[in-house]
Swiss-Prot record:
One of its GO terms (biological process) is regulation of glutamine family amino acid metabolic process. Involved in the regulation of glutamine synthetase GlnA, a key enzyme in the process to assimilate ammonia. When cellular nitrogen levels are high, the C-terminal adenylyl transferase (AT) inactivates GlnA by covalent transfer of an adenylyl group from ATP to specific tyrosine residue of GlnA, thus reducing its activity. Conversely, when nitrogen levels are low, the N-terminal adenylyl removase (AR) activates GlnA by removing the adenylyl group by phosphorolysis, increasing its activity. Residues 1-443 are annotated as: Adenylyl removase. Its cofactor is Mg(2+). It catalyses: [glutamine synthetase]-O(4)-(5'-adenylyl)-L-tyrosine + phosphate = [glutamine synthetase]-L-tyrosine + ADP; [glutamine synthetase]-L-tyrosine + ATP = [glutamine synthetase]-O(4)-(5'-adenylyl)-L-tyrosine + diphosphate. Residues 450-950 are annotated as: Adenylyl transferase. Signal peptide: none annotated. It holds the Pfam family GlnE. GO terms for cellular component: cytosol. The gene is glnE. This is Bifunctional glutamine synthetase adenylyltransferase/adenylyl-removing enzyme. GO terms for molecular function: [glutamate-ammonia-ligase] adenylyltransferase activity; [glutamine synthetase]-adenylyl-L-tyrosine phosphorylase activity; ATP binding; magnesium ion binding. NCBIfam families: PRK11072.1.
């Protein structure tokens, strides 16, 4: 710990003065060495120690303590208690502050602790001084004017809200403090000769508090107090009641005030039961329930004003306000807090470092980017503290003076100024790169949108001009129709209450939107769909700002809406899904098949389990988000049709599991659980998926065909306060499951659920005992029910029930059957279905129900399983048609060529149905489409079922 020669004269002079004062005689040598080092770096430490003999004498004992913050308040309170006038109190406050600041500076310059410890001590010291000064002055004011009370006579406190770095627990060395004063209720003082209003009492108290901390005396000052963040700023009252504060933030609160309020913290809050009421009141203003993308533009405007100030004042070397400085790191963190804090509790923390950690955990930024930000923040904050501790001055501008530059470099551990400057520039460059990527840079020269796209919006009241632009400049074939659509859209918007901000955003957005739409060859499809969506969200400015601020989201919106009216309608109905368009990589990359359950659990974990309504909404939102990603990947060609169905099926299974869990909790809370479960794991309950979900073949609009099973014996009851029969419990459970699935909330329904495939159909038990299910399948089920069983599998349930179901299914499917009878029954059922559902469009081929279509292939696969499983038991293994045909080849039942043709026909027609679903089109095609495949299917049908009805 040595000083370079240019700094030695200053240090030697300080040491001479110290030796003359005599206090070094009592210091250990190690401390003297440290003092000599610090004397070359910090004028503040030297002058404070020389001026305060009591400090100089007690410094060795102080510095031997690793931490002092725990005792700040008790020690200061004791000293203030003895002060009966302002002069004495002000002196105590300033001496206390200076002594503790020397301790902190000493630890900083000798690198004896972490940045976090330094910031914590600085923040705790400020809070202790604010709160104990308030307590001292409150007592004096009560003696003079009485105690402020509410209508019930209860004493009223003044709560002091610390803003900015003070609130965040990250105060810098020579920071000012931003405060807001408030009190719970209006009323009058009691106990004095003359009462005054609470507002008057607290205003006087606030003025005295500010004076005690801010006024310059012989001993200096404590903190510069800034009250400009209060409602109405300098023109507003110094103190406001809770009610007035709430009215202001609800009606007039501005974006920058939301930004400022993120770090707000009540000083000494543990002393006030009234704190919780204030916290609950302010939270909705700061953290919106919806994803709030307006924050980006607001923060960008603030950054623009700051940058202008930097240029105007020539603050080019400012490590706080300059490009890549501390403020940009704060903005990056607070963008995510303001946008997503309403939905992500982890983002509601005040401290910047813990917020960055939450951003990393939520994967909102790349891990490397967060690491750069954390490293830069710690580096720049340490540099800022040392810079300010040199002379106890509030500055973030790097010095021009060479001696000061060298002192700062040495304090930071460098031997040369240039090395420090290089590292500062590297850190700030990395920060600015992240900032520009996320928030944008007002310095960037953005290429103007082509003139005709601006005119297309500006001239939307003039049909001739619009049509000319569409026809001549954009070469649109349907110019007249599109012109009408644009003009009508703008006319409709004129009737809506958009507000000035909404119209401003819309005017910026529309030319960009037209540019994206007309870049696509299918613009005539995209334009009406996107305009319809915008019409639905026009009054919700945050969504317009999302599209305006994120070109990638705008591009994906146009692409998806142009490709699929199904998606455009989904986005228009549930605009919360627009959030998914921001990151194309995530949008076109659906969740891994084996991760749907985990992702859903994590998605639901943020919502209290007892909040049934929010849980139901969250289930629907998760399904919509995942379905959007699957459809986007489908459109992009990332997923083939079978993989699309796999994803939709695994998604449905994850949701079934979550719904059963929710329903179980709700029913068990009321009735307890069936007692036969006490000595075993699981719920004794199963959901069997039939049809498309059973065969891993779900489509975008598929229902869920399910059967509920349980293994509850008779004469079993529940163990709750309200006891019911065990089988009645499972009935209530199934009813609750169906309710959760089918209830229409603000986010729609979850799935249409069909339980008619249960034993005895709609007249049978809603939940069937597994032994009764087995008996029914063996003795009473029709052939078509056994056909349905081919495509049935357990999608939720205990291992025991799964084993039982698999056994029953295998035994039933592998029963010997009379071939001729089976052929006739299968063919007859198919003929009935075709008569009822097929051939409704004589000029079109219905992909599912017409001859040679998907249902023929499914019936053929089911017939072959039922007919040959007795001698080929492996045929019962699979529930999906593709693997059934593969097994038929492997077992020698069907020739490979025929099986491959049927598989190709099946997947091709399913693919077409998927595509037409995305386009909101019926599942039919022209009669000349898929002719060869249809003929192959019909030929196979004739060969295997030999029925005169075909």
């Amino acid at each position: 710990m040595s000083l370079p020669s240019p700094l030695l004269p200053v240090a030697e002079l300080a040491m001479q003065n110290a030796q003359q004062s005599g206090y070094l005689e009592h210091w250990p040598q190690a401390l003297i060495t440290q003092f000599q080092f610090i004397s070359g770096l910090s004028k503040f430490v030297v002058e404070t120690v020389q001026r305060d003999a009591q400090l100089a004498e007690g410094l060795p004992e102080m510095l031997a303590q690793e931490s002092r913050q725990e005792a700040y308040r008790t020690r200061l309170a004791e000293q203030l208690q003895a002060c009966h006038d302002e002069v004495a109190g002000h002196r105590v406050l300033r001496q206390f502050r200076n002594r503790e600041m020397v301790y902190i500076a000493w630890k900083d310059f000798t690198q004896a602790w972490s940045l976090e410890a330094s910031l914590s001590h600085l923040s705790e010291l400020a809070e202790a001084m604010i709160f104990e000064t308030y307590q001292w002055q409150y007592q004096l004011c009560c003696q003079e004017w009485g105690t402020p009370t509410n209508a019930q006579g209860e004493a009223q406190p003044m709560l002091i809200i610390g803003m900015g770095k003070l609130g965040g627990g990250e105060l810098n060395f020579s920071s000012d403090i931003d405060l807001i004063f408030t009190y719970p209720e209006n009323g009058e003082t009691q106990g004095a000769r003359r009462s005054i209003a609470n507002a008057q009492f607290f205003t006087r108290l606030g003025q005295r508090l500010i004076k005690a901390l801010d006024q310059q005396t012989f001993d200096g000052f404590c903190y510069r107090v800034d009250m400009r963040l209060r409602p109405f700023g300098e023109s507003g009252p110094l103190v406001m009641s809770y009610a007035a504060l709430e009215d202001y933030y609800q009606e007039q609160g501005r974006d920058w005030e939301r930004y400022a309020m993120i770090k707000a913290r009540v000083m000494g809050r543990e002393m006030y039961p009234e704190y919780q009421e204030l916290r609950q009141m302010l939270r909705p203003f700061v953290f919106r329930r919806y994803i709030d993308f307006s924050a980006i533009q607001s923060l960008r405007r603030m950054k623009s004003m700051i940058s202008s100030e930097v240029r105007r004042r020539g603050l080019s070397n400012n490590i706080k306000l300059g490009a890549g400085g501390i403020r940009e790191i704060e903005f990056i963190a607070q963008v995510f807090q303001l946008i997503r804090g309403g939905r992500e509790p982890a983002l509601r923390q005040r401290g910047l470092l813990v917020t960055l950690e939450a951003i990393k955990q939520l994967q909102l930024l790349e891990e490397a980017q967060v690491c750069h930000l954390v490293e830069a923040y710690k580096y720049l904050r340490r540099l800022e503290n040392l810079l300010q501790a040199m002379a106890d001055k509030q500055t973030q501008t790097l010095p021009d003076n060479e001696l000061e530059q060298l002192a700062l470099a040495v304090a930071m551990g460098y031997s040369q100024w240039q090395a420090l400057q290089n590292d500062v520039q590297q850190h700030m460059a990395k920060v600015h790169a992240v900032f520009v990527t996320l928030i944008g840079d007002e310095e960037d020269e953005v290429s103007p949108v082509e003139r005709h796209f601006n005119e297309l919006w500006d001239m939307a009241h003039n049909p001739e001009v619009i049509e000319q632009i569409l026809q001549n400049d954009l070469a649109c074939q349907n110019a007249a129709t599109m012109s009408e659509q644009i003009i009508q859209f703008k006319a409709d918007l004129a009737k809506k209450t958009l507000g000035p901000r909404g119209r401003e955003v819309l005017n910026r957005l529309m030319p960009k939107l037209f540019s994206a739409i007309f870049a696509d060859a299918d613009a005539q499809f995209g334009l009406p769909r996107v305009l319809h969506l915008l019409h639905n969200i026009a009054t919700r400015t945050t969504y317009l700002e999302l599209l305006d601020e994120h070109p990638a989201a705008l591009t994906q919106l146009v692409r998806l809406c142009t490709a699929s009216p199904m998606i455009s309608e989904q986005l228009a109905r549930y605009p919360i899904l627009l959030d998914e368009l921001i990151d194309p990589q995530q949008l076109y990359n659906p969740i891994a098949l084996d991760a749907y359950r985990t992702e859903l659990r994590d998605f639901l974990a943020r919502i209290p389990e007892d909040d049934v309504e929010q849980q139901m909404d969250a289930l629907r939102q998760f399904k919509q988000i995942c379905s959007l990603r699957i459809a986007a990947a489908d459109i992009a060609g990332v997923l083939p049709v079978m993989k699309v169905s796999d994803h939709l099926t695994y998604l449905a299974e994850a949701i079934v599991e979550a719904v059963v869990h929710q329903a179980w909790q709700q029913v068990a809370e009321k009735y307890g659980e069936p007692t036969h479960l006490k000595d075993r794991e699981g719920k004794g309950f199963a959901v069997v998926g039939y049809g498309k979900v059973g065969g891993w073949e779900l489509g975008y609009n598929s229902d869920l065909d399910v059967v509920f099973l349980h293994d509850c014996p008779v004469n079993v009851y529940t163990d709750g306060k309200k006891e019911i029969d065990g089988r009645q419990f499972y009935l209530r459970l199934a009813q609750r499951i169906i309710h959760i699935f089918s209830t229409r909330t603000a986010s729609g329904i979850l799935y249409e659920v069909d339980t008619r495939l249960r034993p005895s159909g709609a007249s049978g038990l809603l939940v069937c005992p597994v032994d009764a299910f087995e008996e029914y399948q063996h003795n009473d089920a029709w052939t078509w029910e056994h056909q349905a069983l081919v495509r049935a599998r357990m999608i939720y349930g205990d291992e025991h029930l799964a084993s039982e179901f698999h056994r029953v299914r295998h035994q039933v499917l592998a029963k010997p059957r009379e071939q001729a009878k089976l052929q006739k029954e299968v063919a007859d059922m198919r003929a009935k279905m075709r008569d009822h559902l097929g051939g409704k469009k004589s000029d079109r081929f219905m992909l599912k129900q017409d001859q040679g279509g998907i249902t023929d292939i499914e019936f053929l696969a089911q017939y072959l399983v039922l007919n040959y499983s007795a001698e080929k038991p492996k045929l019962t293994r699979w529930c999906d048609n593709v693997r059934i045909f593969e097994t038929l080849i492997a077992q020698g039942v069907m020739e490979e060529a025929q099986a491959m043709l049927l598989t190709q026909a099946y997947t091709t027609m399913r693919d077409e149905i998927h595509r037409r679903n995305l386009l909101n089109l019926d599942a039919d095609v022209a009669l000349d489409k898929f002719v060869a495949l249809r003929q192959g299917v019909s030929k196979a049908w004739q060969e295997w079922l030999e029925s005169s009805t075909i």
